[in-house]
Swiss-Prot record:
PANTHER family: 50S/60S RIBOSOMAL PROTEIN L14/L23 (PTHR11761), LARGE RIBOSOMAL SUBUNIT PROTEIN UL14M (PTHR11761:SF3)
TM segment ranges: none
Protein's UniProt name: Large ribosomal subunit protein uL14
PROSITE patterns per the UniProt record, alphabetical: RIBOSOMAL_L14
Record note on quaternary structure: Part of the 50S ribosomal subunit. Forms a cluster with proteins L3 and L19. In the 70S ribosome, L14 and L19 interact and together make contacts with the 16S rRNA in bridges B5 and B8.
Gene name of the encoded protein: rplN
One GO CC annotation: cytosolic large ribosomal subunit
UniProt-listed InterPro entries: Ribosomal_uL14, Ribosomal_uL14_bac-type, Ribosomal_uL14_CS, Ribosomal_uL14_sf
Gene Ontology MF terms: large ribosomal subunit rRNA binding; structural constituent of ribosome
Source taxon at top rank: Bacteria
Length: 122
């Protein structure tokens, strides 16, 4: 459950380390984002030689949340942190590597490039 002003770790090598959610995309009064949802975010912490800079506004897809996700088979899955992957204008990841596990719900939202780069899909 990601909403405005939520801080998320960045799970790729785009150069950003932490982002803060500004808006949840999809719907005019949409409040929460879960795994697989796209958000607009501001970069709060970044590496000096990265592709994105501090203060830059980016789009990102949520790949892990602390709030549990209910699957269709009744099982629940939750992660230790809130994490996202930064996207470009064509909804492709900016980074070339993904760190940490990624939820299977990302595949259902057609982010296949993220799923193929991820070391583990849970």
């Amino acid at each position: 459950m990601i909403q405005s002003f939520t801080r998320l770790n960045v799970a790729d090598n785009s150069g950003a380390k932490e982002i803060m959610a500004i808006k949840v995309l999809g719907g005019s009064k949409r409040r929460y984002a879960s795994v697989g949802d796209v958000i607009v975010a501001s970069v709060k912490k970044a590496l000096p030689n990265g592709k994105v800079k501090k203060g830059q506004v980016v789009k990102a897809v949520v790949v892990r949340t602390k709030k549990e996700i209910q699957r269709e088979n009744g099982s629940l899955i939750r992660f230790d942190d809130n994490a996202a992957v930064i996207l470009d204008n064509k909804n492709e990841p900016i980074g070339t590597r993904i760190f940490g596990p990624v939820a299977r719900e990302v595949r259902y939202k057609n982010f296949m490039k993220i799923v193929s780069l991820a070391p583990e899909v849970l």
